[in-house]
Amino acid sequence: MTNFWILELIKFVVLLLLAYGLGRAVQHAGIKVNYTRKIIHFALFFLPEYLKTFLPYKAGFGTILVSGTLFLLTIALMVKPIRSRFSLFNTAFASIDRPEDRPHTMLWLSTQVMATFPILCLIVYLLEQYDRTILIFITVIVAGLGDGLAEPVGVRFGRHKYATRALFSDRKYTRSYEGSACVFFSGIFACLILKGEMSTIELILALSIIPVAMTLAEAFSPHTWDSPFLYLVGGTTTIMVIEIASLFAIG
């Protein structure tokens, strides 16, 4: 477990410095927060996996729970009473504070994290019962890559919009079909990446169900609150694939 704690410390330092640098880019270079926020999104998802190649540890229900708690505490450093006193945290916060999200930025971010990690822990626990924990990476790839690309692609290339709501607000927001397509194609990509961990029937079922289901989850989820829905739907459909495939095996 020593490697796990070292990894978490490195992740905290790197993400904080990255957020600070991107925050300065927002404040002084006029870079859109839509882009800097997603850079942090990618780093949050893929930095730990990169670090694990040097600091391997056995991931499971417990490590995910601890990691989620630590991340929530990291977010707490950016609440207004703290960031107003420390320029480091105030600048870092600028990298994730989209103007259209104000004044709900911290509320939406913190509640999303609090909802996502219990769902992730539950899905990992259930997959452990099948000895198929590795398949959680289908959902992780879609949530990390697909959802990460959806917003910048939508901002840059989105021409076909649809409306979505947000929690605790009557304001309407928009997503794009071009952005949602990123979620769909990342679902196909994720299933193909993990094909070595699935039987032929599981792969066929996964390709038929998971990309569509997760695209719909992202499309209908509240603004900024897509992660809990992606993990819930992605994890549930992955387990569904395992169960349905087992019926074919029995038959």
Give each language-model segment a name.
Residues 68-72:
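N-terminal signal-anchor transmembrane alpha helix
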Residues 196-199:
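Phosphate-handling active-site elements
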Residues 2-7, 22-64, 76-189, 194, ...:
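Interhelical loop and helix-boundary elements at the membrane-water interface
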